[in-house]
Amino acid sequence: GNTYYDINTSFLGLNPYFYLFLTIPVNLLLMDTFFYFLHRIAHISILYNNIHNYHHKYRPITSWISRVSHWIDSNIENIAFTMPFVLIPTYFPLMWVLLMFTFYWGCLIHDNKLDLNNKYINCPISHGIHHKYGKDNYNFSYYFTHWDRICGTYKKKKIN
């Protein structure tokens, strides 16, 4: 990886603490980018029917479903969540905090009840729509909805 252990290490001539805090949103955005595009690929018919559908077949979706995946799917997901640490220097303890946050966020968005009422952050309602439509192409993102909006795959909840 591209991790570092001394919190006082400076990159790009930036203050080490400024850089440390800057890497948080940068890592989350990169994770979301890798996840979005790899997740879209997982919804191609042959991959969805043979691999990714294993994650989508469980009803109702719950936090436990976030960890239920085909082993190939799990490894591809791991690429999305670890690739940012290969690309940008990240403080080693922060890497672990971000990975734990990613794990818990996955549990949260599979809860299927919480509505953050924020069109820019992926929430359980949004991800529930993704699971409802299965192979169809909606709401692929993990943290944020910008890639879904840019690529035309965002589907908002219907208000009754």
Annotate each PLM feature.
Residues 8-11, 34-38, 82:
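Short, mixed-charge, low-aromatic patches
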Residues 21, 25, 37-38, 68:
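Hydrophobic alpha-helical transmembrane segments of multi-pass membrane proteins
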Residues 24-35, 97-106:
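Alpha-helical transmembrane segments of multi-pass membrane proteins
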Residues 42-160:
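Cytosolic/stromal cytosol-facing helical appendages immediately following the last transmembrane segment
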Residues 12, 19, 34, 117, ...:
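Generic detector of bulky aromatic hydrophobic side chains
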Residues 1-3, 28-49:
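Transmembrane alpha-helix/helix-exit interface in multi-pass inner-membrane proteins
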Residues 1-31:
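Juxtamembrane helix-loop-helix connectors linking adjacent transmembrane helices
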